[in-house]
From Swiss-Prot:
GO molecular function annotations of the record: structural molecule activity
Keywords: Acetylation, Cell membrane, Cytoplasm, Cytoplasmic vesicle, ER-Golgi transport, Golgi apparatus, Membrane, Protein transport, Repeat, Transport
Function field: The coatomer is a cytosolic protein complex that binds to dilysine motifs and reversibly associates with Golgi non-clathrin-coated vesicles, which further mediate biosynthetic protein transport from the ER, via the Golgi up to the trans Golgi network. Coatomer complex is required for budding from Golgi membranes, and is essential for the retrograde Golgi-to-ER transport of dilysine-tagged proteins.
Organism the protein comes from: Bos taurus (Bovine)
Annotated InterPro entries: ARM-like (IPR011989), ARM-type_fold (IPR016024), Clathrin/coatomer_adapt-like_N (IPR002553), Coatomer_bsu_C (IPR011710), COPB1 (IPR016460), COPB1_appendage_platform_dom (IPR029446)
Protein name, as recorded: Coatomer subunit beta
Length: 953
C-alpha cells in the first residue's frame, strides 16, 4: 500500500467482450442448476454486486436454494456474498430476510467441521450490523472451548472485533479472554488473546504478564513478539514501569527466535541507557549478524549498531566490543564487510588498536591465499585503507603494518597496490623513524612490481627518501637490474640479429585428408617457416615498460636519478666517485632518450617526456645550488603541504560529524525531572513500533522544507486547460521506488460522463502498475483517480496520456482530452555521496557515457555558480574547500552522487570568469558528466541545463 492510499480495494476484472448475464438466467441457475452451475452463478452475482449492481430479487433465491447446501466451495463464496450484499433498507433498517441468514450463521458456528466454524468466525469480524451479531453471541462464546486451535483463535479475533465495535454485546470480553488466556496452551491462541488484552484492557494484560514473567522464555516466538511490543508501549507511556519489566527484556535477548532477539535489543536500548543494557543489546546484534545467513538482515542489524555508535554515551561501551564486531568479517558479502570495517575504525581506541591490527593483518594474508575474485581484490583494498587509517591515527602501529602491506606492491591488482603505495608514501613522510625500514622493504619488492603506475610511485619514493650512500647505491643497482643491458637500442638490435642467424625452423603441420569435387581423396600438408620469439616476460620490468612505449615512467626515473645523484654528490667527497655516479645516471637517461626516438618501442616518446629527461640531464651537467634545492627540498615540502591539507580536511569533516551528533544544551534550557513531568509530556518521544509500521506501509512522513515553494502544492501539475470539458490536475507523490499520481478529474459540462477513463503511458524506465478503473461523473462532479508507477532506474521519465469518456445519451464516438506530459524529477532519486580521489579517477576512466554541458548562466561569481549547481543537482563537491578558496579567475571541481538504485554519477566543473568582459560578465565554461548508463548522464545534463540560471528575486 502506498503512502497516498489508506483503504484497500478489491478490484475484479470483467472481460470487456463478455455479455453481462441477466437476472432471470442467474435466478434459473441458482434455483434449478446442479452444484457446479450454482457455484458459477454465485460467482457472477458477486462480481455484479461488486461492480455496483443491486440485484435485490436474488437475495431470497440464494437463501432458499443455495444457503442450505453443504458444499465447501459454495460456503466460501457465500461468506463473500454476505459480506458485500446490502443488508439494510434505504432508511437503515435490517432486511427481514437477514433473520434467516442469521440462523444459518448460528448453524455454521455449531458445525462439526472446524474449517467452516473458523471461517465463519473470521467472516463475523467483518460484519457491522449489531442486530445480526446479537443472536450469535452464545455460539461465539462456545467456540472458545472448541477442541481445535483454529476455531479458538478465530473466536478470540471475533470477540475482540465485536467488543471494539459493539462493546454492549459482550461487556465482559476482557475478563472472558483473560480467563481463556490463563488456561490456553496453544501459542497462536495465546498470542491473539494477549494482543486483544493489550488493546482492550492493558492492565489485565500486564497482570497476566506479571504472573508468568519468569516463563516468558518458554513461550512461542509470536507471543514473545507481542510481549516485547506491550513492554515497549507501557514503558514509553509510563517510564516508571521500566524497572518492573526490564528483566523480562533481558531474558528475551536469549530467545531462540532471531526476530524476538532483534526487537528485544531495540526495546532494551530505548528503555535503558545503562552501559550493561547497551552492551547486552550490542552483543545481541553482533550475534544476529554472525548467525543470520541473509545479507539484507546483516546490513539492517549493522545499521542498528551504527545508530548506537552515533550516541556519544554509547560509543564508549561499543569500543569494548570492537573485537566481537570484527567477527562479522567472516561474512563473504563485500557490503557487509565494508560497513563492519568502517564501524570498527570509528570505534577503535588506543586500548584495542593492537588487537585490531593483528586481526586485519590476518585478514590481509587470507586474501592472498584464496582464489582471485573481484570481491577479494576489493576486500583487500578495504583492509589496506583501514590499516592505513589506523596507522595515521595510531603511529605506533605503523611499524607492524608496513612489512605486511608492502608485500602487496607486487600484487597483480593495481588498485590494491596503489592503496598500499599511498599508505607507504604518507607513512614515510610522517614517521621519520620508519624511513629506513620502508626503504629497505621497498628495495626488496622493487624488482617484483608488475604495474607501471606502482613502479613509477615506488621510484619516486626511493628517489625522495634514500638518504645514505648505501641506499643510493642500492637504488642505482635496482634500476640497472630493472633496465637490463645498456645501451638499450644496440642490445635490442643485437638480440634481433642474434635470433636471425640460425636457420629458420621448418615445421610441418598435421596431414589432412580432403575430399575433392570429384569425390576422390587428396592429401595436404602445410609447410611453414617460423622464427622463434622470446617471451616478453623474460624482459626486465623497466625495459618492458619502455619497449611498450610507456615513457612517462622514464620521466619519473630521470627525476629519481637526478635526486639521488645530487644527494650522492653531497654525501661523497671523492670527485672521481661523484663524476662516475653522475655519469652513470646521465648515461641511463641518454640511452632512454635514444630508445624513445628509435623505432623499437610500440609508441614513440612524447615531447613532454623528452623535455623532462633533457631538463634532468641539464641539471646534472650544471649542478646549480638552486636546482639542488628544488629537487631535494621543495619537492618534499610540496608532499608535506598536501598531506597536511588532507589531514586538516579530515579533521574538519570529523569535527562537523561530531557536532551533528553532540546535542548542545543551552545555559537557559529547562531541565526535565521525571517526577515533575506531566504524563502527557512523557509521550513526546516517537513510538518506534508506530514508525516502523508506517514505514512498512509506505506512509513515512518526509520533512517538508522551510521554503514555502517546496510545499506539496509545488508538485501539482495541471494536465488540461480550464476550457476543456474535463479539467484534470495531478499531485506527484514520490516514494523510494514508486510514484503515485493522485489525479483530480472535474466534469465541467452539464452532461453525465460515462466510462470516464484515465489512459496513461510512460517513456523511460517507468512502468505503469495497473490501469485505472473507469468511472461515471455527474454534471459538474469531480473524482480522484490514483495511478501507481514503478521506477527502475535514475533517468528522466515522462508520463503522458489522455482522458476518454462517453456522454450519456449521445450517439457520437468516444470523446478524448489529451493531457499535458508529466516530467519525473530525477532529483528525488539522487543523493550526495563521497569517494576517494583514486576511486573517482577509476570510475571516470571506466564510465563510457559522457555528457558535456556548456555553461550558460547569469551568475557572475565562480563560487556562487558552483554552490548553485550543487544545490540543483544534489551532488557533493569532492574538491576540498581550501582548493576552491581565493580568486584566480578560473575554477575546477569534482562532483559525485549516487542514486538509490546504486548508480554512480560523476561531474567535473571547469569554469572561468572572462575578465576582459568586465566584472559583471557571467561565468563561462563546461560541465562534463560521466555515468555508467546513458540515461543517467543525459538526465543529469538536462537537469543542469534547466537550472543553470538563477532566478532573480
Amino acid at each position: 500500500m502506498t503512502a497516498a492510499e489508506n483503504v484497500c480495494y478489491t478490484l475484479i476484472n470483467v472481460p470487456m467482450d463478455s455479455e453481462p448475464p441477466s437476472e432471470i438466467s442467474l435466478k434459473n441457475d441458482l434455483e434449478k442448476g446442479d452444484v457446479k452451475s450454482k457455484t458459477e452463478a454465485l460467482k457472477k452475482v458477486i462480481i455484479m454486486i461488486l461492480n455496483g449492481e443491486k440485484l435485490p430479487g436474488l437475495l431470497m433465491t440464494i437463501i432458499r436454494f443455495v444457503l442450505p447446501l453443504q458444499d465447501h466451495t459454495i460456503k466460501k463464496l457465500l461468506l463473500v456474498f454476505w459480506e458485500i450484499v446490502p443488508k439494510t433498507t434505504p432508511d437503515g433498517r435490517l432486511l427481514h430476510e437477514m433473520i434467516l441468514v442469521c440462523d444459518a450463521y448460528r448453524k455454521d458456528l455449531q458445525h462439526p467441521n472446524e474449517f467452516i466454524r473458523g471461517s465463519t468466525l473470521r467472516f463475523l469480524c467483518k460484519l457491522k450490523e449489531a442486530e445480526l451479531l446479537e443472536p450469535l453471541m452464545p455460539a461465539i462464546r462456545a467456540c472458545l472451548e472448541h477442541r481445535h486451535s483454529y476455531v479458538r483463535r478465530n473466536a478470540v479475533l471475533a470477540i475482540y472485533t465485536i467488543y471494539r465495535n459493539f462493546e454492549h454485546l459482550i461487556p465482559d470480553a476482557p475478563e472472558l479472554i483473560h480467563d481463556f488466556l490463563v488456561n490456553e496452551k496453544d501459542a497462536s491462541c495465546k498470542r491473539n488473546a494477549f494482543m486483544m488484552l493489550i488493546h482492550a484492557d492493558q492492565d489485565r494484560a500486564l497482570d497476566y504478564l506479571s504472573t508468568c514473567i519468569d516463563q516468558v522464555q518458554t513461550f512461542g516466538d509470536i507471543l514473545q513478539l507481542v510481549i516485547v511490543e506491550l513492554i515497549y508501549k507501557v514503558c514509553h507511556a509510563n517510564p516508571s514501569e521500566r524497572a518492573r519489566f526490564i528483566r523480562c527484556i533481558y531474558n528475551l535477548l536469549q530467545s531462540s527466535s532471531p526476530a524476538v532477539k532483534y526487537e528485544a535489543a531495540g526495546t532494551l536500548v530505548t528503555l535503558s541507557s545503562a552501559p550493561t543494557a547497551i552492551k547486552a543489546a550490542a552483543q545481541c546484534y553482533i550475534d544476529l549478524i554472525i548467525k543470520e545467513s541473509d545479507n539484507n538482515v546483516k546490513l539492517i542489524v549493522l545499521d542498528r549498531l551504527i545508530e548506537l555508535k552515533e550516541h556519544p554515551a554509547h560509543e564508549r561501551v561499543l569500543q569494548d566490543l570492537v573485537m566481537d564486531i570484527l567477527r562479522v568479517l567472516s561474512t563473504p558479502d563485500l557490503e557487509v564487510r565494508k560497513k563492519t570495517l568502517q564501524l570498527a575504525l570509528d570505534l577503535v581506541s588506543s586500548r584495542n588498536v593492537e588487537e585490531l591490527v593483528i586481526v586485519l593483518k590476518k585478514e590481509v594474508i587470507k586474501t592472498n591465499n584464496v582464489s582471485e575474485h573481484e570481491d577479494t581484490d576489493k576486500y583487500r583494498q578495504l583492509l589496506v585503507r583501514t590499516l592505513h587509517s589506523c596507522s595515521v591515527r595510531f603511529p605506533d602501529m605503523a611499524a607492524n603494518v608496513i612489512p605486511v602491506l608492502m608485500e602487496f606492491l607486487s600484487d597483480s591488482n593495481e588498485a590494491a597496490a596503489a592503496d598500499v603505495l599511498e599508505f607507504v608514501r604518507e607513512a614515510i613522510q610522517r614517521f621519520d623513524n620508519l624511513r629506513m625500514l620502508i626503504v629497505e622493504k621497498m628495495l626488496e619488492v622493487f624488482h617484483a612490481i608488475k604495474s607501471v603506475k606502482i613502479y613509477r610511485g615506488a621510484l619516486w619514493i626511493l628517489g625522495e627518501y634514500c638518504s645514505t650512500k648505501d641506499d643510493i647505491q642500492s637504488v642505482m643497482t635496482e634500476v640497472r637490474r630493472s633496465l637490463g643491458e645498456i645501451p638499450i637500442v644496440e642490445s635490442e638490435i643485437k638480440k634481433e640479429a642474434g635470433e636471425l642467424k640460425p636457420e629458420e625452423e621448418i615445421t610441418v603441420g598435421p596431414v589432412q585428408k580432403l575430399v575433392t569435387e570429384m569425390g576422390t581423396y587428396a592429401t595436404q600438408s602445410a609447410l611453414s617457416s617460423s622464427r622463434p620469439t622470446k617471451k616478453e616476460e623474460e624482459r626486465p620490468p623497466l625495459r618492458g615498460f619502455l619497449l611498450d612505449g610507456d615513457f612517462f615512467v622514464a620521466a619519473s626515473l630521470a627525476t629519481t636519478l637526478t635526486k639521488i645523484a645530487l644527494r650522492y654528490v653531497a654525501l661523497v667527497q671523492e670527485k672521481k666517485k661523484q663524476n662516475s655516479f653522475v655519469a652513470e645516471a646521465m648515461l641511463l637517461m641518454a640511452t632512454i632518450l635514444h630508445l624513445g626516438k628509435s623505432s623499437l618501442p610500440k609508441k614513440p616518446i612524447t615531447d613532454d617526456d623528452v623535455d623532462r629527461i633533457s631538463l634532468c640531464l641539464k641539471v646534472l651537467s650544471e649542478c646549480s645550488p638552486l636546482m639542488n634545492d628544488i629537487f631535494n627540498k621543495e619537492c618534499r615540502q610540496s608532499l608535506s603541504h598536501m598531506l597536511s591539507a588532507k589531514l586538516e580536511e579530515e579533521k574538519l569533516s570529523q569535527k562537523k560529524e561530531s557536532e551533528k551528533r553532540n546535542v548542545t544544551v543551552q545555559p537557559d534550557d529547562p531541565i526535565s525531572f521525571m517526577q515533575l513531568t506531566a504524563k502527557n509530556e512523557m509521550n513526546c518521544k516517537e513510538d518506534q513500533f508506530q514508525l516502523s509500521l508506517l514505514a512498512a506501509m509506505g506512509n513515512t512522513q518526509r520533512k517538508e522544507a522551510a521554503d514555502p515553494l517546496a510545499s506539496k502544492l509545488n508538485k501539482v501539475t495541471q494536465l488540461t486547460g480550464f476550457s476543456d470539458p474535463v479539467y484534470a490536475e495531478a499531485y506527484v507523490h514520490v516514494n523510494q521506488y514508486d510514484i503515485v499520481l493522485d489525479v483530480l478529474v472535474v466534469n465541467q459540462t452539464s452532461d453525465t460522463l460515462q466510462n470516464c477513463t484515465l489512459e496513461l503511458a510512460t517513456l523511460g524506465d517507468l512502468k505503469l502498475v495497473e490501469k485505472p478503473s473507469p468511472l461515471t461523473l455527474a454534471p459538474h462532479d469531480f473524482a480522484n483517480i490514483k495511478a501507481n508507477v514503478k521506477v527502475a532506474s535514475t533517468e528522466n521519465g515522462i508520463i503522458f496520456g489522455n482522458i476518454v469518456y462517453d456522454v450519456s445519451g449521445a450517439a457520437s464516438d468516444r470523446n478524448c482530452v489529451v493531457l499535458s506530459d508529466i516530467h519525473i524529477d530525477i532529483m528525488d532519486y539522487i543523493q550526495p555521496a563521497t569517494c576517494t580521489d583514486a576511486e573517482f579517477r577509476q570510475m571516470w576512466a571506466e564510465f563510457e557515457w559522457e555528457n558535456k554541458v556548456t555553461v550558460n548562466t547569469n551568475i557572475v561569481d565562480l563560487n556562487d555558480y558552483l554552490q548553485h549547481i550543487l544545490k540543483s543537482t544534489n551532488m557533493k563537491c569532492l574538491t576540498p574547500e581550501k582548493a576552491l578558496s581565493g580568486y584566480c579567475g578560473f575554477m575546477a571541481a569534482n562532483l559525485y552522487a549516487r542514486s538509490i538504485f546504486g548508480e554512480d554519477a560523476l561531474a567535473n566543473v571547469s569554469i572561468e570568469k572572462p575578465i576582459q568582459q568586465g566584472p559583471e560578465a557571467p561565468v563561462t565554461g563546461h560541465i562534463r558528466i560521466r555515468a555508467k548508463s546513458q540515461g543517467m548522464a543525459l538526465s543529469l545534463g538536462d537537469k543542469i541545463n534547466l537550472s543553470q540560471k538563477k532566478n532573480s528575486i
